[in-house]
Amino acid sequence: MIRKFDAKDFKWDGVDTLVYKQDGSPFKDVTRQVLYDGAFDIPCQFRYFECLPGGYSTLEYHEHTHMVMIFRGKGQVLLGDEIHDVEAGDFIEIPGKTIHQFRANKGDYIGFLCLVNQDRDKVKLLTPQEMDTLRSNPKIKEFLESC
């Protein structure tokens, strides 16, 4: 199977562009495309997420590890207790139980490919206590309040 990529629209033939999540999690201006969903003997899911300028993914963590490659644009990723600038071509390993969030720069998209196991645990949102711990770091507090 070959899915042709349209570089103008950042879409693949035969792949629907979906709402990022439908579980009530907080996010802003993010879409999801599922490019591969566990066919044959590879039980994984390969997805493309895109945040519009100023958009961001859910601040979350989970038990499973996942791999991300920035495919378009630039922005920041909150990974554990650090904020990193990222851009197209950067590869990010997100270990299980690591708090993370992707954010597009104002005026720029950020699109990323993400590989996860098809069978995985559910996302966990941060508790008020976990949020307080994060906000005790002034850089992270500023990052979280900047959107």
Label each residue range with its predicted role:
Residues D81-G96:
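Short acidic-glycine-tyrosine-enriched beta hairpin
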Residues M1-P43, P128-C147:
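A short, N-terminal "cap"/entry segment at the start of jelly-roll beta-barrel domains
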Residues E93, G107-L125:
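A short hydrophobic beta-strand segment most commonly corresponding to one strand
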Residues H64-H66, I70-G75, G80:
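Glycine- and acidic-residue-biased ligand/ion/polar-headgroup-sensing regions
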Residues D37-G38, Y56-H62, R103-N105:
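Short histidine-centered beta-strand/loop micro-motifs
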Residues R32, R47-H62, G96:
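Conserved short histidine dyad/triad with adjacent acidic residue
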